């Protein structure tokens, strides 16, 4: 469909929640949805249904100014749905929310999927993309560099394990760095390195023991979407590295 020639049809077929969404302070959740629904002529929105969909039934009479960040985002999603769109665009809908509020928004988005809505979501949280998305597009410098189901992206772009060492001992980083393993993340608390085999884990642990260094705990797991993103974009999460910068 030509967007320039069919603007009216497009507006009625899509919904959009911008990043940094805000609304009118002194009107209630119900009044807010009623207001936005009136912007679409010839349509009658199911306001009660939208309130229930985003789990705001007990907040329907609450003014916008009294809502928490998570509740505001859920209201924003409801606003994006007032015209019953075929496709919903959500720009960073969980940015700045605490973990509990983020998960509440995730539940709403999963509910949209169950209702058959097509949701296009932008996010910097790879955990969020891995959990919610059927298809992920990784964008770097304005270009799509990879696209596919999260599981396939991980499987096709990784052939290693991730070892996490919980350590307050700065000498642990020096041991790992000297052995030449590729770091994923390093700070004063955790060291994450990529290893090809479980035998490499034993080599690292033995080297740490021989050096007299200490660690509090360890974890070995398969890579996740965040590691794929870092690998494919060439970006790193190395911060406060001890003994020099890690590889990027």
Where are these regions (language model features)?
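Conserved ABC ATPase "signature" region
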Residues: 34, 38, 44-59
